[in-house]
Amino acid sequence: MGKYEDMLIEHDYIEVIECDNLPKRLSGLWLGDMILINRNLPITSKLETLAEELAHNELTYGNIVDQSSFNHRKFEGYARRLAYEKLVPLKDIVKAFLQGIHNLYELANFFEVTESFVLQSIEHYKQKY
């Protein structure tokens, strides 16, 4: 079982539905007590989307789909940063290095996320620290 399935089990109190009728620009959507995820995404992207939508459940409120509002973009950033920290914890980057993982591809496989997500996570940590 992978991290996506583990996260689904850990958060079984929230209904997660994989569907194929979300707007093209959305990989997932949090609707109060339900999360919709685009079923056509690769499993790595589903994990990233689930983590971000769970972060929205934890941190934000209301409809923030319209990103033209500064506050909506701010809330989106909060959720994304929490997803980075949950899926690519700093201590686990060190752990991966100590296990002999020295390139982006292997690091993405280690965390079961996309290479892009690993790079964004590292950039987040650079800005944070």
Task: Indicate where each model-derived feature is located.
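Active-site hotspot residues in diverse enzymes, especially metal/ion-binding acidic/histidine motifs
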Residues: 1-129
